From Swiss-Prot:
<keyword id="KW-0717">Septation</keyword>
<comment type="similarity">
    <text>Belongs to the MinC family.</text>
</comment>
<dbReference type="InterPro" id="IPR016098">
    <property type="entry name" value="CAP/MinC_C"/>
</dbReference>
<keyword id="KW-0132">Cell division</keyword>
<dbReference type="GO" id="GO:1901891">
    <property type="term" value="P:regulation of cell septum assembly"/>
</dbReference>
<dbReference type="InterPro" id="IPR036145">
    <property type="entry name" value="MinC_C_sf"/>
</dbReference>
<comment type="subunit">
    <text>Interacts with MinD and FtsZ.</text>
</comment>
<comment type="function">
    <text>Cell division inhibitor that blocks the formation of polar Z ring septums. Rapidly oscillates between the poles of the cell to destabilize FtsZ filaments that have formed before they mature into polar Z rings. Prevents FtsZ polymerization.</text>
</comment>
<dbReference type="GO" id="GO:0000917">
    <property type="term" value="P:division septum assembly"/>
</dbReference>
<dbReference type="InterPro" id="IPR007874">
    <property type="entry name" value="MinC_N"/>
</dbReference>
<keyword id="KW-0131">Cell cycle</keyword>
<dbReference type="InterPro" id="IPR013033">
    <property type="entry name" value="MinC"/>
</dbReference>
<dbReference type="Pfam" id="PF05209">
    <property type="entry name" value="MinC_N"/>
</dbReference>
<dbReference type="GO" id="GO:0000902">
    <property type="term" value="P:cell morphogenesis"/>
</dbReference>
<dbReference type="Pfam" id="PF03775">
    <property type="entry name" value="MinC_C"/>
</dbReference>
<protein>
    <recommendedName>
        <fullName>Probable septum site-determining protein MinC</fullName>
    </recommendedName>
</protein>
<dbReference type="InterPro" id="IPR005526">
    <property type="entry name" value="Septum_form_inhib_MinC_C"/>
</dbReference>
Amino acid sequence: MSQTPIELKGSSFTLSVVHLHDSQPEVIYQALQEKIEQAPAFLKNAPVVINVAALTAETDWIKLQQAISSTGLHVVGVSGCTDDALKKTIAQAGLPLLSEGKAQRRVVEPVAAVPAAVKTKVINTPVRSGQQIYARNCDLIVTSSVSAGAEVIADGNIHIYGMMRGRALAGVSGDVQSQIFCTHLAAELVSIAGRYWLSDQIPEPYFGQPARINLNQLDNVLTIKPLD
C-alpha cells in the first residue's frame, strides 16, 4: 500500500516576536539591525512574527515590511492586529494573521490539590553548536556545557551544570514561574515565557558566574541573582 503524499501533524516552534512601537520604516530598520548585530547567531536570517498591536491604520505596511525583510529577517506571520483596514493590507501582502489567544483567567482553588510528579529530561553530553534540545512538558537538566549556537528549550525550568554559551528558553509554553539555573552564565540569550535578554543585557556582575534567572510577575521583567 503506497504512502499518502502528505501527512499533517501538530508541532510547536520557538519564534521571536518583534513588537513594533514605531511605524517609521527607517527607525524599525535601524533598531533591528542593532539587535541582529548584538546576537547574529540567534537573529541573522531568523523567522519572526511581527506584533502590530501598537500600530494604526495609517501605517504604511508595505514599506514597513520591506524594511524588516531588508534586514534578513523572514516574516512568517503578524499578530496583535485589531484594525480591519490594516488587517486587509497585511493579508493582501500574503502574510497570515496569527491569533495569540486570550490568557486564561486564574482561579484560586480553596481545595488543596495533590501535586503532580515533575518530569525531568536529563542530557549528560555537551550540546554542540547547531543542536536544539527541547524538554516538552517538563524541566531540562544539562550536566555538561552548551556551546554558542546551541539551543536548550523547556516548558519548565532549565538547569545547566556547565558553561552556558548558547541560548536557553524556559517556560516556552507560557509558564511564568519557570526559572533558569546556570553554574557559568555566558549565554547568547536567556528567555522565560517569551521575555528575554540578549548577552549584552545580562547584568555584567553575573556574566560568567553562577546565576539564577526568573520572571518578576509584578512587572513582567526578568530578574537575576547569584546561584547559591
